[in-house]
Amino acid sequence: MNLREKYHIPNDSVITIAGTVGVGKSTMTRALAQALDFKTSFEKVDTNPYLEKFYDDFERWSFHLQVYFLAERFKEQKKIFEYGGGFVQDRSIYEDTGIFAKMHFDKGTMSPTDYETYTNLFDAMVMTPYFPHPDLLIYLEGSFDEIISRIQERGRDMEKSTPISYWEEMYNRYTNWIDNFNACPILRINISDYDLMQEENPIEQIIEKVGRSLQHSRRYTRRELAR
């Protein structure tokens, strides 16, 4: 019996991994997908026509970049459900508006008109009963010091040259965002309790929690539909 069967995880489940930069989303995505025999869905950065322009001029390209991300994630989410589920997804569609677009608006690198247009578009496309929301959002969290340590350890040039103040702001924005998130069921995992980089095999403990969360959310959904 594999772990998916052992913990009664439906083979059409869609699980998305969320959390700030450096928290371990990609590692968790790969580990869960391998253990559950699910497919993975990763963000396609290399084909983004706005990313390089955006880094040269935030104010000019922030709206274009966010609309591009929204369209790509929407298409990916639709494809996952058309395929029949069985996916673990690295980063959710909800973070684009709740974290990144909001940050650009707050900092003045996205105009009020562009921000309103973007959020209206997001609400019309995503925040409806017709959008295929994930069955579960796993939110990875940890102390700020732990996350900074991970960012420094992986040694990406762009991240190493980014001021600590930026990562602290991002960390705080994520904390506020998840505390108010209710678009789909959430499972919060602390990276200090289940460190996939350090422990021999904590993945079964995580999958057990995933199974319980999915069973609870599906029972709740059935009760709501029966009303």
Kindly give the residue locations of the regions a language model identified.
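NTP-dependent small-molecule kinase module
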Residues: 5, 148-227
